[in-house]
Amino acid sequence: MKTIKQIAFIGLALVVNIASAQRPDFLKKDSIQSALDGNTQVIYYNKTTASTPQPLIVELHSWSNSAESQQKIVAEQTHAKNWNFIFPNFRGVNNHPKACCSPFVIADIDEAIDWALKNMSVDTQNIYVVGNSGGGYATLAMYMKSRHNIRSFSAWSSISDLAAWYGESVERKNKYAAEIIQCIGKDSQYNALNAKLRSPLYWKTPVKKRENSLLQIYVGVHDGYTGSVPISHSIDFYNKLLSDGKEKDKSRYVSKQDADTLLKTQSFPTSKTPQTLGNRAILYQKTSKNIRLTVFEGTHEILNEVVLEKIQRLD
């Protein structure tokens, strides 16, 4: 288990990293009008300069950010590979009814992908969606509901159950409980049914549509302690997909005992030298077909330096 000093160091490193992040100069800005309600959605993008079609990275902003405000993004890493990149606003900060993985959010992101396919030289066999925190939440939502054929999804620090997260946020006395009510409340009161309607954990899994798509779920083991989203959200969603996909091998699931160990001790016992994710130890990993859960030494974060190196395959 990490000491208080070590956890504090991780938190400080995150603050320094976020503070030093800058929006790349090469990003351009455009806008799209929603077919649902005429809303104007801002998008940031960068096109490949290659002579042949290249992959498309669709990055989704976090809960408290918009495409205008979020600074830490994978645009630099995408630019280094000369791939296409798009960063849509999809209703901005999650504090109003049309945000928070509403039908408007799903449609906005799908329309941003439409824009990219029309205006960029995209290899349509290699479209990737990535997001952290609220962006991880939106990434899971797109796995479940996007009309596009997406090759791979990379979800980090994800919310999967808005109803559970409301209760967790109330207990922690943070700002998110009030924002959840702003998204799904009825008469300014929390509405459990509406919360579940916005939760990928309760949605029907498109097993057939996603049979050739990869889903990589990443979560730092300290999230929920030093971060705002308990790792149970990622674990429960992973297990749900296996159940919906009728995975028969019980060893592929995260057992209750394993989940309890991870949640209560923020570690997992092993006699082997752990594999790494970038420079972080992988504490626990489960895989079923094209779906993988990775619990790593970290907190509520995305490791930008490894996202694109891992997004194309399970290895």
Cite the ranges covered by each PLM segment.
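Bacterial Sec-dependent N-terminal signal peptides
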Residues: 1-22
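A domain-start/cap signature at the N-terminus of enzymes
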Residues: 19-54, 132-134, 172, 183, ...
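Short substrate-entry loop that stabilizes the transition state in hydrolases
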Residues: 51-54, 59-98, 162, 225-227
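Structural recognition of the beta-strand scaffold that forms the well-ordered cores
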Residues: 56-60, 84-89, 126-130, 152-157, ...
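Mobile cap/lid helix-loop segments that gate and shape the active-site cleft of serine hydrolases
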Residues: 64, 69, 152, 158, ...
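Primarily recognizes the serine-hydrolase "nucleophile elbow" in alpha/beta-hydrolase
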Residues: 65, 70, 117-119, 124-172
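Alpha/beta-hydrolase active-site loop
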Residues: 100-120
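C-terminal catalytic histidine-bearing segment of alpha/beta-hydrolase fold enzymes
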Residues: 216-218, 224-225, 231-315
